Regions:
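Alpha/beta-hydrolase active-site loop
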Residues: 80, 113-134
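N-terminal cap/lid segment of alpha/beta-hydrolase-fold proteins
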Residues: 23-52
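Catalytic active-site module of serine/aspartate enzymes centered on a nucleophile-bearing elbow/loop
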Residues: 283, 289-334
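Primarily recognizes the serine-hydrolase "nucleophile elbow" in alpha/beta-hydrolase
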Residues: 130-187
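Short, surface-exposed "cap/lid" segments of acyl-processing enzymes
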Residues: 51-53, 57-88
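Short beta-strand/loop motif that positions the catalytic acidic residue
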Residues: 242, 248-250
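Accessory cap/linker subdomain of secreted extracellular hydrolases
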Residues: 166-237
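Conserved alpha/beta-hydrolase
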Residues: 80-107
Length: 356
């Protein structure tokens, strides 16, 4: 008996050690790049080990030079997209996130900012989606867009094999209106009038060269072609055109996009699920609505994501996977339609071969 106890403790220690090492090794981290034919986009894949192909999420980042992890030289180092990808992988959901054209390691794909447009970003999402749909390691594709990425994903979705779309902190109103609201409380009256004049010109499709130094970072001439393309779009209208299941997630302490935006998206597509999260800010952390803690969250990559966000997103994706699995035996048991019968209705979340 005296020798069995140390052996038992040793066996327990070895078991715990093996479990500690098993969790990270159960998720593959791999580069995942896309050659678009006019530039290579660099990305990262998180793939949980699974006996069956898991669903895969394509994460579409927000505005400006936001990289694949969610970091932005103007918006902070907080890695919100990386943290979301990790949380989804722990729940059996694969993901690909990427540096946008002209950003970080995809800079060479668009070295000139003047060459960027919403249409270019939409085409890139379509190309990524087509590659993921061809990859046999994945069962189904879900687009997840954050902030401006929700608009880009909404515009791209009808051209992709995506079966669901999730909009996180996505605007529900035209972006020029959003910029005006954001500037209204931050600029003195004279500068605000100048900004309104420039925004009106861009909305009309006209570039401006007379940008005051105080506004140069936001409205510099090199970014104006992109803003002109962005101001043409209506996020709610684009979202309302979608014919796939959709989830809207919005934090109540978001100082950049408000609950009214999420409600506008739901009005545009009433069958969408809407989840409002108390305390969550724009970068998906729990933070006060004002003060230093709200701002400091933008530069703290170690803050955990809002738990309700991860639960809502993963539940929506996994329920879609279960619905697809449940529909398969039913479709297989149906008799083949005769020429006089109508084509079987496509089950929610299920792709039929004719639709590809």
């Amino acid at each position: 008996m005296k020798t069995s106890m140390p052996r038992a403790l040793l066996a327990l220690f070895c078991l715990l050690a093996s479990l500690a090492h098993a969790a990270p090794n159960s998720i593959l981290h791999r580069p995942y790049d896309l050659d678009t034919g006019h530039g290579v986009l660099r990305g990262s894949l998180l793939l949980p080990r699974s006996a069956v192909p898991p669903p895969v999420v394509l994460l579409v980042a927000g505005s400006g030079p936001t990289d694949r992890d969610g970091n932005n030289p103007f918006g902070g180092n907080n890695r919100y997209l990386l943290r979301l990808a990790e949380a989804l992988a722990e729940r059996g959901i694969a993901s690909v996130r990427y540096d946008k054209r002209g950003v970080a390691r995809s800079l060479a794909a668009a070295p000139r900012e003047e060459d960027l447009s919403v249409g270019v970003y939409v085409d890139d999402v379509v190309a990524w989606s087509e590659r993921l749909a061809r990859d046999p390691r994945f069962s189904r594709l879900i687009l997840v867009g954050h902030s401006e990425g929700a608009l880009i994903a909404s515009l791209a979705a009808p051209r992709t094999p995506a079966e669901e779309l999730i909009a996180i902190a996505g605007s529900g109103q035209p972006i020029d209106r959003v910029l005006r609201e954001q500037l209204r409380g931050r600029l003195p009256p004279a500068q605000l009038r100048q900004a309104d004049s420039v925004l009106a010109s861009l909305k009309a499709g006209e570039t401006r060269g007379d940008i005051p130094p105080a506004l140069a970072n936001l409205l510099r001439p090199s970014v104006q072609p992109y803003l002109i393309s962005l101001f043409r779009e209506d996020p709610a209208r684009a979202f309302g055109r979608l014919r796939i299941p959709t989830l809207i997630v919005q934090g109540r302490n978001d100082i950049q996009v408000g609950v009214a935006d999420a409600e506008a998206l739901q009005r545009a597509k009433p069958d969408s699920q809407l989840v409002l999260i108390d305390g969550m800010n724009h970068i998906l952390r729990i933070a006060p609505s004002t003060g230093l803690q709200q701002l400091s969250a933008y530069n703290d990559p170690n803050l955990p994501l809002a738990r309700q966000l991860v639960e809502a997103v993963s539940r929506f994706i996994l329920r879609g996977a279960e619905a697809e699995k449940a529909a398969e035996p039913l479709q297989k048991s149906l008799p083949a339609p005769t020429s006089s019968e109508s084509r079987p209705v496509k089950a929610a979340g299920q792709r039929m071969s004719d639709d590809r």
